[in-house]
Amino acid sequence: CTTGPCCRQCKLKPAGTTCWKTSRTSHYCTGKSCDCPVYQG
């Protein structure tokens, strides 16, 4: 990957790394994508 909240220095961040946080919930990197997964609840 080159850009995205789950990408660092052209490498994927580890699964479980926080990529987006609000006062109510957090979203975590999957380790398989440079994008932050969107909660579908």
Curated annotation (Swiss-Prot):
Subcellular location: Secreted
Motif (Cell attachment site): 21-23
Effect of R24L: Decrease in inhibitory activity towards alpha-1/beta-1 integrin
Domain of life (superkingdom): Eukaryota
Keywords, comma-separated and alphabetical: Cell adhesion impairing toxin, Disulfide bond, Secreted, Toxin
Presence of the UniProt keyword Transit peptide in the record: no
InterPro entries assigned to the protein according to its UniProt record, in alphabetical order: Disintegrin_dom, Disintegrin_dom_sf
Tissue specificity as recorded in UniProt: Expressed by the venom gland.
Major location (coarse): secreted
Bridged cysteine pairs (disulfide): C1-C10, C6-C29, C7-C34, C19-C36
Gene Ontology MF, one: toxin activity
Domain Disintegrin: 1-41
Cellular component, GO annotation: extracellular region
Gene3D superfamilies: Disintegrin domain
Function according to Swiss-Prot or TrEMBL: Potent and highly selective inhibitor of alpha-1/beta-1 (ITGA1/ITGB1) integrin binding to collagen I and IV. Is about 25-fold more potent than obtustatin inhibiting the binding of this integrin to collagen IV.
Similarity comment: family membership: Belongs to the disintegrin family. Short disintegrin subfamily.
Assembly with partners or alone: Monomer.
UniProt name for this protein: Disintegrin viperistatin
